[in-house]
């Protein structure tokens, strides 16, 4: 964490699950200031009171800025003096974005362009943009807008000598806001059947802590224009639902299949075939450098193409598949799950 000593970090969309995870990890370090930039004053007020209660000695390091990434001036107003940015602001609910695609464009695409424009103008040292596996071979509005967000980031990186811009791609972050596990827990507590979309559907799974780890890895190891992913495991939705049932006393026979929602895929991809051809293996991570060739293709016809890997696409069907016990152990290790289990024991 020495790179953050006395530095100012700005988190867009900072009142979400990712922002909370960053605060929990960073506040007790020697970071100078963390700026939470978001448009919901109620969530900011809740976060302010939460951290004043549980970390009163360091809560003053948090500064709150009301604004919207869609508004360039509000972004610029909050960015003066910022050293680093974690860009997490997004519309990420797949069905909602299917019904309101232009809202997804305004936040995920135009908002990202505003953040990166302001960052370059203000001389920010590094911006990490948070993307999603749905940006690879996208079929829904959310994934398409996040794919364009990545393209915007790469294009901006070509124009930036002083500001390093990288993207990270996530699978499903368990127990993050709007994710399915908290819904299932509520259904079990209320005596209702668990509802799932399609039992054989597979998804990458990772914890909020692993999500922060990926951003920090990109921050420390990424180069300008890079895309970085973690080699995450996956499981079927059926396995995930059964694991939650076993942990919280739900009845597996009560699991109800409701069908695939708008815009959903049977499996997700973290790296496409084309990206795998350029990917650099970094242990638990892959790094994909930007394609910084120019538009003058004549010289490439003469010189030939770069050397390419023989890797095939990295998706939730061909990664490590967790069985029921492995999935249950991974879910049980989450702090959110431990807190929910403790609440049940107290009743």
Residue map of PLM features:
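N-terminal Rossmann NAD(P)H-binding glycine-rich loop of SDR-like oxidoreductase domains
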Residues: 7-29
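Conserved glycine-rich Rossmann-like NAD(P)H-binding loop of the short-chain dehydrogenase/reductase
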Residues: 30-43
